[in-house]
Design a protein with these regions (language model features):
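Intrinsic disorder/low-complexity detector
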Residues: 4-5, 13, 129, 195, ...
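Sequence contexts marking disulfide-bonded cysteines in secreted/extracellular proteins
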Residues: 1, 47-49, 53, 110, ...
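Cysteine-nucleophile protease catalytic domains, especially the papain-like/related folds used
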Residues: 2-99
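Extended hydrophobic/Leu-rich segments
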Residues: 1, 6, 10, 14-18, ...
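...with weaker cross-activation on analogous glycine-rich loops/strands in unrelated enzymes
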Residues: 77-148, 154-181, 185
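Active-site or metal-binding loop neighborhoods of secreted/extracellular toxin and effector enzymes
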Residues: 141-236
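Mature extracytoplasmic/luminal segments of secretory-pathway proteins
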Residues: 45, 103-106, 219, 232
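Ubiquitin-like/PB1-type beta-grasp interaction modules and other compact soluble beta-rich domains
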Residues: 29, 37-50, 104, 110-119, ...
């Protein structure tokens, strides 16, 4: 086995895939809410779909909808219909050569691709989740490194923290965590579900927010890591 491209922990050992998680391709971005953290830059202008395919708008109050990039979206489309949402997403990914493809949750994406998942509450809303690589979070001030590693499902040596018991707000970097992130409405990015638990697999996460329950799984896609780049509103 060639371990050259396998993620490693801070001590140089091979990083452990999060328990109950899904495999990484190695092309996932590091999670941080910095880009979307400001009222002016990210929260108001970007939605879960834009984040999923790495399209970032620094201006405008209009959020990107599936089918807009490919100009296949019509006024009569119901994007909470799984079939329609899937078709419009595929059309958008096809606007670029090797932009992305339909995938399986349990099979890692090809090199240079990362994984996203879509769910709907029929007649109400759709929602997207995106798998990340390393994850940078802020401590809640309640857990030490051992308990946090156990809670996430990774080895302790995959965590980098200022102390063994970081104070509230202190940064913690988790190597190759493979957690899933998402963005709801005007909120910040998060790797937590509706119950405040780390998202290891969106299919197992709590996806109920008030009267909206994203209970219907639509599909999994692998998106080219460069799909959203090269535009004025790309993440990087």
């Amino acid at each position: 086995m060639n371990n050259a491209n396998v993620p490693r922990s801070f001590d140089g050992s091979l990083a452990k895939m999060v328990k109950g998680g899904l495999p990484l391709s190695g092309s996932e971005e590091t999670f941080t809410n910095f880009v979307y953290g400001g009222e002016r830059w990210g929260k108001r202008n970007n939605n879960c779909y834009g984040f999923a395919i790495d399209y970032f708008k620094a201006s405008e109050n209009r959020k990107l909808q599936p089918g807009e990039l490919s100009k296949t979206l019509t006024p009569h489309d119901d994007l909470t219909d799984p079939k329609v949402l899937k078709e419009r997403t595929i059309a958008d990914l096809d606007t670029k050569t090797n932009g992305g493809y339909v995938a399986s949750p349990c099979i890692k994406c090809k090199k240079n691709y990362y994984k996203v998942m879509a769910f709907v509450d029929k007649g109400k809303d759709y929602h997207w989740y995106r798998q990340m690589g390393d994850v940078l979070i802020e401590s809640d001030g309640q857990k030490n490194i051992n308990s946090l590693a156990k809670n996430i499902g990774v080895d302790k040596n995959q965590l980098n923290s200022p102390t063994n018991r970081p104070a509230k707000g202190e940064p913690i970097l988790i190597k190759a965590a493979g957690l899933w992130s998402h963005k709801r409405g005007l909120s910040e990015l998060t790797v937590l579900d509706a119950s405040g638990k780390f998202i290891k697999d969106p299919r197992d996460a709590n996806r109920t927010y008030g009267n909206i329950n994203y209970s219907t799984y639509v599909g999994t896609f692998c998106v080219n890591k460069d799909f959203g780049k090269g535009k004025s509103f790309a993440c990087n």
